Amino acid sequence: GGVRLSANSDRVARFEADLSGMPDVALPVIVACCLSDTPFHLTGLDTLYIKECDRVMAVTREAGKLGYGLQIPARGELCWDRVRNACTTLEIDTYQDHRMAMAFAPAGVRYCGLIVRDADVVSKSFPGFWEQYDHLVM
């Protein structure tokens, strides 16, 4: 199992996926969809409420800071229909969750000056994350 990503000119009108078999990819998928202006509807997110933090609440709140109006239509679901609001701050809280920090890192390319607070939390699973990230974006 897994996901293969590739670049092409085809644009998805709306990304829909059941992530119950791979819930840990939800956060980067959500942020990637927002950054690429791709509406989405994700299901199978039931376990995200009981991770290092309530990831559904956390990603909804932090994406909201950047102006993305995510919606929770039902427990275990999250969607975004391209609702945009004003960006209120460029400081992203991680809630001491390594996956929150890593998921929002690419937003720094779009939002100059983005600050990921408690960024060292990535050491839980990927101590060299920020060094690798710097190699990718430099």
Which residue stretches match the model-derived regions?
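Conserved phosphate/oxyanion-binding catalytic-loop motifs
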Residues: 98-101
